[in-house]
Amino acid sequence: MKRAPTKQPAKPAARGGERAQGRVIAAHGRHYIVAPADGGPMLQCFPRGKKSEVAVGDRVAYERTSADQGVIVEIGERRNLLYRSDQFKSKLFAANLDQLLIVLATEPYFSEDLLGRALIAAEANELKPIVVLNKIDVEAALPVARERLAPYRALGYDVLELSVKGAPDDARAQLAPRLAGHSTILLGQSGMGKSTLVNLLVPDAEAATREISAALNSGRHTTTFTRLYPLQDGGALIDSPGFQEFGLYHLTEGRLERAFPEFRPLLAHCRFYNCHHLHEPGCAILEALADGRIAPTRHALYAQLVHEASQIVR
């Protein structure tokens, strides 16, 4: 009499060599953490080939190489990609974003150049910018900070005044509705209170950071990788390491002029269609600068960015 065949155990959904879908939730060098779309445990992935174009927020296809590792073989179509660049290299921030939240503080003194560049990057990528002024409980420094931010309020930018440590409930009440359902990247210089803000909005952020750091084998570098935190009310918060420079060498002159909201209504009124808005006669931008409708600091930033862009061979 023939014996009945033994029943084989069910095979895992994504075996070695089989493609699966996921989302990149952390990046450190060429190491990436991918959260599988099927809800399985996260795994460490590496890009195929020497050059990596993977960013946090990317939807990717990967092939599993072991129980907890894989190779990224394809990057899904992106809505956008935020990055900074100089003459020699680019640094990716994140992909598929809706908003850019810039964290400033009354002290230490924030860089207005970095603020201006972050706003230009947001405009060029069609992201909604939100400016946070933290540490408003430092009352001695508050009037100067407000005065410095007044021109940006006048341009229509959201400027939220918070004290994340001193009044956390108020900070959460202001931010949570603006972040719900959106993918938001958090940018700021070191010392502005960015980490405190993340811990306020993502209660288990420290535990998640330790877990990701262990998976990346980078326990000594817990603040030097970009990571994505899902939010309780939907959406995601992407925290990027603090930085001191924000090069935008990759933006063409045409993209730059349209990234200044105060320039846009005037662009069609220049005498020359290829006006550079630097010293040309009949330039509507320069006329607005002369009569005070455009701030000198903003035009100076535009001129600097155009100069930087001219250094790149396209």
Curated annotation (Swiss-Prot):
Keywords: Cytoplasm, GTP-binding, Hydrolase, Metal-binding, Nucleotide-binding, Ribosome biogenesis, RNA-binding, rRNA-binding, Zinc. GTP binds at residues 134-137, 188-196. Zn(2+) binds at residues 270, 275, 277, 283. Binds 1 zinc ion per subunit. The keyword rRNA processing does not apply. CDD domains: S1_YloQ_GTPase (cd04466), YjeQ_EngC (cd01854). It comes from the Bacteria. Transmembrane segments: none annotated. Its cofactor is Zn(2+). Monomer. Associates with 30S ribosomal subunit, binds 16S rRNA. One of several proteins that assist in the late maturation steps of the functional core of the 30S ribosomal subunit. Helps release RbfA from mature subunits. May play a role in the assembly of ribosomal proteins into the subunit. Circularly permuted GTPase that catalyzes slow GTP hydrolysis, GTPase activity is stimulated by the 30S ribosomal subunit. This is Small ribosomal subunit biogenesis GTPase RsgA.
